[in-house]
Amino acid sequence: MSENKAHITVNNKKIELSVRKGTLGPGVIEIASLYKETDTFTYDPGFTSTASCESKITYIDGDKGILLYCGYPIDQLAEKGDFLESCYLLLYGELPTKQEKIDFDRCIMQHMMVHEQFTRFFHGFRRDSHPMAVMVACLGAMSAFYHDSIDIKDAQQRMIAAIRLISKVPTLAAMAYKYSIGQAFVYPRNDLSYAANFLHMCFSVPCEEYKINPVLSRAMDRIFTLHADHEQNASTSTVRLVGSSGANPFACIAAGVACLWGPAHGGANEACLKMLQKIGSVERIPEFIARAKDKNDPFRLMGFGHRVYKNYDPRAKIMQQTCHEVLKELNIQDDPLLDIAIALENTALNDEYFIEKKLYPNVDFYSGITLKALGFPTEMFTVLFALARSIGWVAQWKEMIEDPAQKIGRPRQLYTGYAAREYVSIDKRISKNKMTTQ
């Protein structure tokens, strides 16, 4: 990495800071000495201009629409490989050889079963519990069921925990779905692929044979690959921050799942489907398009544009292709929401307003439609996102633990509250709050 210097003057004191340049993307100013030298912090709400770590895993260029896993473009990985190949890549930094792929796949498939006591653990939840609430609990509980792999200082235990998370999260996700609809849990099968196994555990029933549709299985696999990692987003940063305290890996991933549950992060595809429900019919699309263009109208089209990608989301093109393959394979012709989605897509792609502002349908738009076509209810969408992102969280956590520069996260603040004041006895206080109790 090349290095030069930045100079900053604070309170008439000029200091010199190192500037580091990565392989790709913007450089960073190292500010660790800023507080010591100037008694001043930097202020960056949301950390949108702050690099919290050094990483070799995922790179994003939002202006150019680039997403790389360990240097490999996402479209190549999704089209030419499969999800477990991307898992290996994110975990080890290189694509596997043929034999390494065979061994890794076998290892994952042989660890997909979960402890049998998990079946009783599920019965502690209401049937109408949100699946994400169940997943947060299950991921945290894994440290109780698999406490032989929670020593983060042991490299072998770290890798065992990583393998267990990649292999068992789809089983737990399928169990959460089955429990919510009152059906029997389905055990994984070692002869099926990762994605096919997940579909089998979700949709097969004991009374009849479930046949794997290769088109649908491939679509599920692509969805997993496209969502495997996305640099230092909110949930990944949460995993790293929790992990910096020395928490066990299962607790860290549970924290990531909890963060992903937030509608501003992982709930975008679910929000997109709810928007389609709000539109209601193809005939009302022009009305909502007009509302989306009106700056004074609070309505926003979900699933269009992206906070990071100022150009086209590189995952969207593959997801669009996959979406249409699924719709064609299933020959869905009488689903009102899918009709609205397809019509809305065509309208937006040909509307000058959306073209000029580069508000293209993003990966959430197409993945939401695809998941609905596959038969998943909207409340499962974020669970599937968490399933796919588990490998990214695991890889980022592992990288952080193995970083010699790693230390516990401790963000600072700009304090704007009261200065020191004297305690007032309760009989002399005057209420300044408008609190109501019931």
Curated annotation (Swiss-Prot):
UniProt keyword Membrane present: no
EC number: 2.3.3.16
One annotated GO biological process: tricarboxylic acid cycle
Alphabetized UniProt keyword annotations: Transferase, Tricarboxylic acid cycle
InterPro entries: Citrate_synth-like_lrg_a-sub, Citrate_synth-like_sm_a-sub, Citrate_synthase, Citrate_synthase_AS, Citrate_synthase_bac-typ, Citrate_synthase_sf, Citrate_synthase_typ-I
GO cellular-component term (any): cytoplasm
Top-level taxon: Bacteria
Claim: Cytoplasm is one of the keywords in the record: no
CDD domains: EcCS_like (cd06114)
Active site positions, chain numbering: 306, 364
Pathway in which this enzyme or protein is active: Carbohydrate metabolism; tricarboxylic acid cycle; isocitrate from oxaloacetate: step 1/2
Pfam families: Citrate_synt
Catalytic activity: oxaloacetate + acetyl-CoA + H2O = citrate + CoA + H(+)
Alphabetized GO MF terms: citrate (Si)-synthase activity
Family named by the database record: Belongs to the citrate synthase family.
PANTHER family referenced in this protein's UniProt entry, alphabetically: CITRATE SYNTHASE
Misc. remarks from the entry: Citrate synthase is found in nearly all cells capable of oxidative metabolism.
Annotated protein name in UniProt: Citrate synthase
Native species: Bartonella quintana (strain Toulouse) (Rochalimaea quintana)
